């Protein structure tokens, strides 16, 4: 039963583009991804996405404490990341990251993120 559950979870994570990993730093955020950690200074569990997500999974929703934008940048590319306090980009924007920006902690954005989109600017 445990093997079936583990296989199912792995398949689900692979299809949604979400990855879980303990992280020691922002450098571990894969190229082309936006990453969020549960702890300040890129500690604890990490979630990463290469696309938009209108409804973060419950373990990371409202527990985000550090962020890194390692997205691809270029003319006309949506390379900024806007994080919102409610699902489906509802409520206010809690933080916006420019290409390459890494934020180890923000009191204004801490534990408030529920969704994000890639955009052409903040």
Question: Language-model segments: which ranges?
Answer:
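Compact beta-sheet-dominated domain cores in extracellular/mature segments
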Residues: 2-9, 14-17, 22-122
């Amino acid at each position: 039963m445990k093997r079936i559950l583990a296989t199912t979870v792995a398949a689900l994570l692979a299809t949604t583009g979400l990855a879980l990993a303990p992280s020691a730093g922002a450098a571990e955020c894969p190229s082309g991804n936006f990453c969020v950690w549960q702890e300040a200074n890129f500690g604890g569990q990490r979630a990463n996405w290469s696309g938009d997500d209108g409804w973060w999974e419950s373990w990371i929703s409202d527990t985000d404490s550090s962020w890194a934008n390692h997205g691809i940048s270029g003319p006309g590319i949506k390379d900024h990341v806007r994080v919102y306090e409610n699902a489906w980009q509802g409520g206010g924007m809690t933080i916006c990251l420019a290409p390459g920006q890494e934020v180890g902690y923000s009191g204004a954005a801490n534990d408030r993120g529920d969704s994000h989109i890639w955009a052409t600017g903040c």
